Amino acid sequence: MVEVRGGWWRLAAIVVLAAGCARRPAPPLAGPSSAPVLETPARVSLIAAPVESDWKGLGDEATALLSQYLRINTTNPPGNEIAAARWLAEVLRREGIEARIFEPAPGKANLYARLAGDGSARPIVLLNHMDVVLASPEFWTVDPFAGLVKDGYVWGRGALDMKGEGIAQLMTMLILKRANVPLKRDIIFLATADEEIGAGVGAAWIAEQQPDLVRAAEFLLNEGGLTRAKTGGQGAVEFYGVGTTEKSPFWLDVTARGTAGHGSRPTADNPVHRLIRALNRVSEWKTPLIVTPAVERSFRDLATIERDTTVRRWLSDIRAAVRDSAAVRGLTSDLTYNALLRNTISITGLKGSNKTNVIPPVATAVIDVRLLPGQDPAAFLAEIVRVIGDTAVTVKPQGPNWSATESSTETEMFRAITAVARRQHPQALVTTLMLAGFTDSHYFRRMGIASYGLGPFPLTQADSRGVHGNDERLSVDALRAGVRFYFEVVSRVAAK
């Protein structure tokens, strides 16, 4: 069997599957301060759009701002995003940009700011989240909330996910304002709470309670992309992956019922046995392979840089590959390829009796289903009930679910991303990504806003291991490149 390496997809999974995976125990608010005093970094004055000589200073300014931002401990839970929102509001106010802070729950805040254009084209939303996942200081070589700048890196929890990208978006706002760039579109800066937990008080709250803030927007930029830097390539970029869609979660509760009793007297309809049989059928079920447009495009593009000739052939024509048994075995043996080609099912929890000698009347399991774009949750539910084939076992969705949608590549924004990427790195590939996880972009795609995941910072595989991991850090060079990338994309689409 051909070994499918799939290293770039594994990296993408590390970067983007982290969404919604925070550990549950609430940590203490360690770190220098939950509300640090704003320090004024060296500020680059502009009378027009930046020229080459300006970018070193703008990168230094971004580094100083990110260092400060990382000192605000927004570990979720509890989040304490109000402190981050107040800090961002002060940075914006200092530049003459007013911001509104919404606090849908105590300590949980969302910040909204807008640069006005002439209204001849629809707005662009720059979306980022302020919360971060738990950092265990005993496993770090630096204080995760000190915002330390050392050895050419800015260190701290959130540097990659996603305070670094938030600073790139913030700097885009500041540069546009400072340089008095005439705009045809409003630029909306939206920093939200709660992305790592999903308790409904962040992007979901904006979409449901304040939709008029963003309803008119044509485009949204968020996390969920990847810029792959060549290892040892001195800043050379191998490819840009732009997130155009993502799988949707469809979490299910499976419940089996039977006759309770004493463990010493087995019953014929023990619900635990019934549940095990049902779950065995589910685990053995091979869901159909489905090729979505985003995956077909990305596989075809990435085939051009795939070194393994067999895998290259599969990726270059994935529709033919999924009809070939050898290709199917090879592709589905790789966890990431498998996740991108089918609806997936993971059994993640079981519960029966809390006593060894008691047969319970009910046994339950939880299943994490991820559906491809275009798949109907109700139809999938009916199919999994058919597979189980036991009327004493019920399957119910845990909560709200949705069908994932895909943002078109035939837009001014996608063309701008491609043009800027190719101007900065002419040899780099630009392609689409579908995330096996999900981001807050789905709230806005469902509002009809074309939403794209950017990974503006050129990262090697080693760099990306810090996402939700120990010693998370972002290089100063990558930060500078990301600020420039964001500004050039946004100004290309929004400037007159």
Language model: regions and residue ranges:
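A common structural junction motif
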Residues: 130-131, 282-287, 385-393
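Acidic/histidine-rich catalytic neighborhood of metal-dependent amide-processing enzymes
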Residues: 153-154, 160-241
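Bacterial N-terminal signal peptides that target proteins for export
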Residues: 1-12
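Acidic/His- and Gly-rich active-site-bordering loop/insert found
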Residues: 24-29, 36-157, 176-185, 367
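Short amphipathic alpha-helices in soluble, non-transmembrane regions
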Residues: 269, 380-388
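An extended, acidic, His-containing surface patch that forms the Zn2+-binding/catalytic region
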Residues: 119-121, 228-230, 288-357, 361-362, ...
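C-terminal motif of bacterial Sec signal peptides marking the signal peptidase cleavage site
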Residues: 18-20
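A short core secondary-structure module
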Residues: 200, 204-206, 259, 264-286
